[in-house]
Amino acid sequence: EAKEERESSPRPVFRAKTVAATPREAPRPKLDHIMRLTDDVGIIQHAKFIVPDRRHGYCTDDNARALIAALMAQDMIADNKAVTSLSCTYISFLHHALNEETGRFRNFMGYDRRWLEETGSEDSHGRAIWGLGEAVALATSEDFRAAAGNLFENGLRALTNFTSPRAWAYALIGMHAYLRQFGGDSE
């Protein structure tokens, strides 16, 4: 009898739209601010409202993140030349940041284009590896992918001596992205 009653008047079930069930559509990115902050060296660390604050110069962390953002935007922006130009600027900064003698990325550069240290933090190195791994995965140009892959590989060796869990986490995210593109690479 209880079964018949339950079948004849079932309890209402609450069904809210969830993130998984709702199609996700991000708004088209606007590059005006990132372009304002970027010069021929890289992206400037800070701004006062919309004005780049040159007193703080540049850092590897921000250029690695800007590289990821630019490459993620490449399919959503009509002006692909601007995105390509930004991406090339950011990877060029990372190339210059790698100290080939130590295998480590420098982090801070003054607006006068002088490095403020010979070796950056482990965290900034991890973020550089993250950015380069994503660049390998997201690049549409084989030449760009090769440049990112070369820098990525040159920065890996230093990770073996790191003690920062955060640096390792960023590097692992970059390795995961790299392996999405080159899944069979075991070196």
Predicted segments, located by residue:
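A contiguous, low-structure linker/loop signature
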Residues: 96-137, 141-146
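Generic hydrophobic, helix-prone segments enriched in Leu/Val/Ile
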Residues: 33-34, 128, 158-159, 171
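Extended, well-ordered alpha-helical scaffold segments
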Residues: 79-97, 140-159, 184-187
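Low-complexity, Ser/Thr/Pro/Gly-enriched N-terminal "stalk/linker" regions
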Residues: 10-65, 69-72, 76-109
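The C-terminal output helix
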Residues: 2-12
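Solvent-exposed loop and edge beta-strand segments that line ligand/cofactor-binding
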Residues: 47-64, 79, 111-125, 155-168, ...
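Hydrophobic, well-ordered secondary-structure segments
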Residues: 149-156, 168-176
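Well-ordered alpha-helical scaffold segments within catalytic/enzyme domains
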Residues: 65-82, 127-143, 170-185
